[in-house]
Amino acid sequence: MPQKWISALLLLQISFCFRSGNCGKVLVWPLEYSHWMNLKIILDELVQRGHEVTVLRPSSSVSLDPKKASGLVYETSPTTSNNDEVEKSFYPVGDMWTYDVPKYTCLRYYPSLNKMFGQFSDLWLQLCREVVSNKELIAKLKESQFDVVLSDAVGPCGELIAEILQLPFVYSLRFATAPGIEKYSAGQPFPPSYVPIILSGFSGQMTFMERVENMLCLLYFDSWFESFPAKDWDPFFSEILGRPTTMVDTMKKAEIWLIRSYWDLEFPRPSLPNIEFVGGLHCQPAKPLPKEMEDFAQSSGEHGVWVFSLGSMIRNITQERANTIASALAQIPQKVFWRFEGKKPDTLGPNTRVFKWIPQNDLLGHPKTKAFVTHGGANGIYESIHYGIPPMVGIPLFAEQRDNVAHMVAKGAAVSIDFHTMSSSDLLNALKAVINNPSYKKKVMWLSAIHHDQPLKPLDRAVFWIEFVMRHKGAKHLRPLAHNLALVSVHSLDVIGFLLACVLAIVLLAVKCCLFLYRFFVKVAKNKRD
């Protein structure tokens, strides 16, 4: 690169520093796959603004490649596990959730979730222990004098590293329905009467029986979340910090929660001042497609193209399911970009092209794209909302995807079908519905207008709050004071108990007075008769 361009880039970074405050030093504890993809967007923007960003990664990492640094500094911690072990801790979770976990009621599938998350937790605890027990690494991090730690709340350890280094920390998280992490760690209010619990697939307007199930699932999830970290993580945190503590108490110290969602996807619900919604921060302007893909898209003529993707966590689907899908796609006039890594289906039509990878963002922003078949991942849904072009057919597979699709269906922007029970005709009817009924496209365009009508873009908002924490050494004035109260006090159970005791005392006193007066007048009447 010519010297003048290097100088120009340096001046640009310096200008960002003056505009947003002093340049800071950010330490990052990320998670793999789509979590990393979203976090990296924030990190790249921080680098563009002149901040020094250091990513702390275990040597056994699947997604975090130091060779693709793009301005990031990587600090690698040696671990005893290898990349295959890390990869195997993620993919079986997706496969098990998709094929083995019972659906329809939380009371049936939460026991399976406990098993799956237990496997992930064991590996992640091992990685965390090896990082924080590395005295040489911790000493180096202390000498670096970071200003803030940015961490993914799903993968514990970032908050522990921040506590060791005595630094404020900011969380990045997708969920926004508060049954576990946000409810206990962030203090997020959760009225189960109109806020559906995560993984329920309910809309904001629940029937009476759905509200009953929602309450039961909430109680079940509360019990699970309280017991889950107590076995291994709480003793580990206490051991490392040298004092009795819990993982949840440490997580409560988060200054800001960056929730990767927004009100275009979420239902209205209470929130807190240290919770910022930044859904869609990863959306970028569409880039030109590779020549092969562009030629295929242009060959669609007036019919346009469909984009079909079930995400990266499900590498293979059964041959029977693949043939069901291919058969339906072969019957539509549109061309289809299908992200699929399995064996070529026997029923694949000439209008369908299979790719192991597709530039999903660029395809959804392409003028030929008419609709989108998605597993309901937040990234894909927000890319669709961002462009406001393709309505959706949702085929949720696991995690919060069922909720994401349910939200889009409730908002009139999608049709949902069940992956396990759908027939070729079911999928075909859903495809025809979103193409032939203009109301779906109108709803997506409406959501897109809402998404873009914000005072700050999601990425700018996320970066602002990270810089805010660096400038002010935290954001304790925004953290809820509920963190200082016991659980009985948070829900005013002590006050309710006190008031009930007062009412009971008054009632007992009134009864005593009535009995006294009754006995007195009975005695007086008796004396008069005598």
Swiss-Prot record:
**Transmembrane region(s):** 496-516
Q: Which residues of this UniProt protein bind UDP-alpha-D-glucuronate?
A: T374, H375, G376, G377, A378, N379, G380, E400
Q: Which locations, inside or outside the cell, does it occupy?
A: Endoplasmic reticulum membrane
Q: Which residues are glycosylated?
A: N316
Q: Name one GO cellular component term.
A: endoplasmic reticulum membrane
Q: Which reaction does it catalyse?
A: glucuronate acceptor + UDP-alpha-D-glucuronate = acceptor beta-D-glucuronoside + UDP + H(+); 17alpha-estradiol + UDP-alpha-D-glucuronate = 17alpha-estradiol 17-O-(beta-D-glucuronate) + UDP + H(+); 17beta-estradiol + UDP-alpha-D-glucuronate = 17beta-estradiol 17-O-(beta-D-glucuronate) + UDP + H(+); 2-hydroxy-17beta-estradiol + UDP-alpha-D-glucuronate = 2-hydroxy-17beta-estradiol 3-O-(beta-D-glucuronate) + UDP + H(+)
Cited CDD domains: GT1_Gtf-like
Q: What membrane topology does the UniProt entry give?
A: Single-pass membrane protein
Drop me one GO molecular function for this one: glucuronosyltransferase activity
SUPFAM superfamilies documented for this protein: UDP-Glycosyltransferase/glycogen phosphorylase
Q: What is its EC number?
A: 2.4.1.17
Q: Which residues belong to the signal peptide in this entry?
A: 1-17
Provide the primary localization: endoplasmic reticulum
GO biological process per UniProt = androgen metabolic process; estrogen metabolic process; xenobiotic metabolic process
Q: Which UniProt keywords apply?
A: Endoplasmic reticulum, Glycoprotein, Glycosyltransferase, Lipid metabolism, Membrane, Signal, Steroid metabolism, Transferase, Transmembrane, Transmembrane helix
Q: What class of enzyme is it?
A: transferase
State the function annotated in the UniProt record: UDP-glucuronosyltransferase (UGT) that catalyzes phase II biotransformation reactions in which lipophilic substrates are conjugated with glucuronic acid to increase the metabolite's water solubility, thereby facilitating excretion into either the urine or bile. Essential for the elimination and detoxification of drugs, xenobiotics and endogenous compounds. Catalyzes the glucuronidation of endogenous steroid hormones such as androgens (epitestosterone, androsterone) and estrogens (estradiol, epiestradiol, estriol, catechol estrogens).
PANTHER family attached to this UniProt entry: EG:EG0003.4 PROTEIN-RELATED, UDP-GLUCURONOSYLTRANSFERASE 2B15
Protein family according to the UniProt entry: Belongs to the UDP-glycosyltransferase family.
The name under which this protein is listed is: UDP-glucuronosyltransferase 2B7
Q: Which organism is it from?
A: Rattus norvegicus (Rat)
